[in-house]
Amino acid sequence: MNTALAQQIANEGGVEAWMIAQQHKSLLRFLTCGSVDDGKSTLIGRLLHDTRQIYEDQLSSLHNDSKRHGTQGEKLDLALLVDGLQAEREQGITIDVAYRYFSTEKRKFIIADTPGHEQYTRNMATGASTCELAILLIDARKGVLDQTRRHSFISTLLGIKHLVVAINKMDLVDYSEETFTRIREDYLTFAGLLPGNLDIRFVPLSALEGDNVASQSESMPWYSGPTLLEVLETVEIQRVVDAQPMRFPVQYVNRPNLDFRGYAGTLASGRVEVGQRVKVLPSGVESNVARIVTFDGDREEAFAGEAITLVLTDEIDISRGDLLLAADETLPAVQSASVDVVWMAEQPLSPGQSYDIKIAGKKTRARVDGIRYQVDINNLTQREVENLPLNGIGLVDLTFDEPLVLDRYQQNPVTGGLILIDRLSNVTVGAGMVHEPVSQATAAPSQFSVFELELNALVRRHFPHWGARDLLGDK
């Protein structure tokens, strides 16, 4: 066992007391990003090492791996703690997103180590989608690069408001204050173009030597600010979803026997309580919450982020992909929306193409009506393009095969975030953030009888593999 962990458990009064204390610590999800070879994996390894999160057998294995695959000469290659794929170790790079957990006396952390190569931008966007803070690594010798700008923009696009700019490898520039100041000013000039009100902090450090990571550096007396770990432990994260209206996307209809019918999912935002009047969209049918069922038993109320099963007082038609919200709230379905898209496929995104999309628990199809612009990541200007290339970021107009209930992504990432899927290969080719729902869904002229419309709805619900189109959607 990790001796530091064993000592901590003993200080807490035993395993049970230690586990209770862990449950009450706040959790921060953050990612490391930046250009290739800026030291992201090494920084995470240093954080784990200096906070004593490495077991003795892991440390012994790390010494052996450093001799075989290490890139730091005689020194311990801490990046190998995170780079687990054989291809990563052979090339000395990060390819996949690696997740690690650690905790201190003040907070719990989940880290996403994302790749720096441009061709793996899709993996970086995946890692950023669940994070609340981003550590942007900058090599002190190279300064602000294209990938630094791209990752900064993607992070803010995905709703991350806290950016920590870690200027790494200060040991290779003789811990120069002038270098730190120059890079800081360069980044602030670029950051002025980023959308939203951002909390940006700068820390000069050396992940390899441990300077300003978990302890103050004696080599940089000119820096009097907090260490990186102190920033992570003290930053205040305000979760937007807690203050937002209730959103409960239905993931699964739970009917284990004839006496129970519940609707399972994760509460995306707001809160729900027993007795509350709720509305089901898109049908608009209302009911009351009879029970809130969890793994630990029934609850009187639940909050954003909790996995629950809702039991309603009425037997009504609810399926996967439907959305429950407060009965007094109005949220119209829309047939189209403008969406910020990060494109992840070799084949460019072009107008006229159709894709499957998934948003919350809903799966349907969408057509690309047009590309308004692509963002130039160097200066964040908008330029007209005919298609969106691999790793391109732009605003795209989508029309859906059926009316959807959406939020803007900045208001609710769950009901405003979607993925685009190639219908032939079933590969995810794009990540989308709803920028603006642009038109309210309206019924087509009454060219079909009531029976035909009801039959169409029945076939689409129970026989989706037939591929029947929505008559009301005029498709």
From Swiss-Prot:
Keywords: ATP-binding, GTP-binding, Nucleotide-binding, Nucleotidyltransferase, Transferase. Pathway: Sulfur metabolism; hydrogen sulfide biosynthesis; sulfite from sulfate: step 1/3. Residues 34-41 are annotated as: G1. Its EC number is 2.7.7.4. Residues 92-96 are annotated as: G2. Residues 113-116 are annotated as: G3. Disulfide bonds: none annotated. This is Sulfate adenylyltransferase subunit 1. It comes from Escherichia coli O127:H6 (strain E2348/69 / EPEC). The gene is cysN.
